[in-house]
């Protein structure tokens, strides 16, 4: 059973490497909206973001870059970028982060845009394995095995995080259901008590008027 689990983790490590690449265009506008790419990173993981754009500074458009996570931490804020840009940071906690761009048109009446190629690597994939191989004098096979081992550990950690998150969400859901049930019971009790009071009040009223 343990060997089967190890095989599953190895396959996951081979097929779900933490590398994300995308290419897209952003048109320039005098009132631009941010275009964001979101990714997830675990606590303590290294994140490497490589950005390559066409165009140049002063070509009538200003491409701005923002890198921030869902907790409000900002890792990079660059204005008027062009060419190649690299962003490196270590995640302080497990969270999602956004790589956002906005393209500001500096000249009216012209249709301009920037092409962006974005590569995001995290965890073991963000490490410089050539440097590690040279410094520790490892064989290529040893480097690959070590990389797969670290990637497998990261997958296990992410599974554990997702499991813990699912448990927290389940606890929250159960707590919400319990509160809704208690509130519903309280509303029913209040309505029954109010109905009984109204019936008693009407009986006393009719008796006072000698109707009954």
UniProtKB/Swiss-Prot annotation:
Locations listed in the record: Endoplasmic reticulum membrane; Golgi apparatus membrane
GO CC field: endoplasmic reticulum membrane; Golgi membrane
Query: Record's SMART domains?
Result: EMP24_GP25L
UniProt keyword annotation of Cytoplasm present: no
Q: Name one Pfam family in it.
A: EMP24_GP25L
Q: Which residues form the GOLD domain?
A: 34-122
Per the record, membrane topology reads: Single-pass type I membrane protein
Query: What range does the record give for the signal peptide?
Result: 1-21
**UniProtKB keywords:** Endoplasmic reticulum, ER-Golgi transport, Golgi apparatus, Membrane, Protein transport, Signal, Transmembrane, Transmembrane helix, Transport
The entry assigns this protein to a family as follows:
Belongs to the EMP24/GP25L family.
Q: What is the name of this protein?
A: Endoplasmic reticulum vesicle protein 25
What is the protein's species of origin? Kluyveromyces lactis (strain ATCC 8585 / CBS 2359 / DSM 70799 / NBRC 1267 / NRRL Y-1140 / WM37) (Yeast)
Give the gene symbol.
ERV25
């Amino acid at each position: 059973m343990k060997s089967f689990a190890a095989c599953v983790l190895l396959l996951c490590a081979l097929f779900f490497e933490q590398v994300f690449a995308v290419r897209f265009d952003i048109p320039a506008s005098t009132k631009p909206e941010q275009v964001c790419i979101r990714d997830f990173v675990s606590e303590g993981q290294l994140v490497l973001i490589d950005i390559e754009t066409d165009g140049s500074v002063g070509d009538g458009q200003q491409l701005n870059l923002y890198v921030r996570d869902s907790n409000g931490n900002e890792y990079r804020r660059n204005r008027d970028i062009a060419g190649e840009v690299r962003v490196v940071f270590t995640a302080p906690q497990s969270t999602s982060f956004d790589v956002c761009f906005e393209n500001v048109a500096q000249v009216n009446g012209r249709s301009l845009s920037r092409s962006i190629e974005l590569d995001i690597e995290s965890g073991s994939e963000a490490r410089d394995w050539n440097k590690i191989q040279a410094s520790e004098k490892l064989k290529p096979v040893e480097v690959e095995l070590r990389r797969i081992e670290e990637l497998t550990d990261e997958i296990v950690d992410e599974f554990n995080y997702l499991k813990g998150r699912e448990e927290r969400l389940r606890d929250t859901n159960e707590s919400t259901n319990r509160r809704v049930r208690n509130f519903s019971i309280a509303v029913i009790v209040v309505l029954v008590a109010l109905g009984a009071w109204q019936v008693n009040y009407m009986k006393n009223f009719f008796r006072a008027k000698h109707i009954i």
